[in-house]
From Swiss-Prot:
InterPro entries, alphabetized: Ribosome_maturation_RimP, RimP_C, RimP_C_sf, RimP_N, RimP_N_sf
Matches recorded under HAMAP family: RimP
Protein name: Ribosome maturation factor RimP
Origin species: Syntrophomonas wolfei subsp. wolfei (strain DSM 2245B / Goettingen)
Principal subcellular localisation of the protein: cytoplasm
CDD domains: YlxS_C (cd01734)
C-alpha cells in the first residue's frame, strides 16, 4: 500500500524501519528518486504515507520520511546497477575467508557475486557472504 502511494508520487520506497525507542514507536521511511529527493518531496510522501498507515491502523508515535542519505544501504540489484562505479563499504559474514570489511569501487554483479575493485585488484564477494553494502563517499 505504501509503495503504491509512493509510486503515484514517482518516488521509490528504499526501506522502512519500525523501532521502539524510550517506549515510543518510530516509523522511519526512506525514499528516493533517480535525481534525488528534496524537502518538498519528503513532505508529500509523509502525507501520503500517514494517510496509508492511518487507514490500515498501523500504530506509531512518530513518522519520519527522508532520503536514504549519502551512506545509503544498497539492497536491490537496481541499487547495484545505479551505483556501479561508486565507492562502497561491504561487511561480510564471519565465515567469509577474506576481509570482514571491504572498501572499494563497486564494479558490478552477477547471480552469485558482487565485484569490487580493491586497491587495483578485482575482488568477487559471494552474495551470500555479504551482510550489508553501503555507499562510502569520500570527503
Amino acid at each position: 500500500m505504501v509503495e503504491e502511494r509512493l509510486n503515484e508520487l514517482e518516488l521509490e520506497l528504499v526501506n522502512i524501519e519500525y523501532r521502539k525507542e524510550n517506549k515510543e514507536q518510530f516509523l522511519r521511511v526512506f525514499i528516493d528518486k533517480d535525481n534525488g529527493v528534496d524537502l518538498d518531496m519528503c513532505s508529500q510522501a509523509n502525507r501520503a504515507i500517514k494517510e496509508s498507515f492511518d487507514e490500515q491502523e498501523i500504530p506509531y508515535d512518530y513518522l519520519e520520511v527522508s532520503s536514504p542519505g549519502l551512506d545509503r544501504v544498497l539492497k536491490k540489484e537496481r541499487d547495484w546497477e545505479r551505483f556501479s562505479g561508486y565507492r562502497v563499504r561491504i561487511k561480510t559474514r564471519k565465515s567469509f575467508p577474506g576481509p570482514q570489511r571491504i572498501t572499494g569501487i563497486l564494479l558490478g554483479f552477477d547471480s552469485e557475486n558482487i565485484a569490487v575493485e580493491l586497491e587495483g585488484e578485482l575482488l568477487k564477494v559471494p552474495r551470500e557472504m555479504i551482510t550489508i553494502i553501503r555507499l562510502h563517499p569520500e570527503f
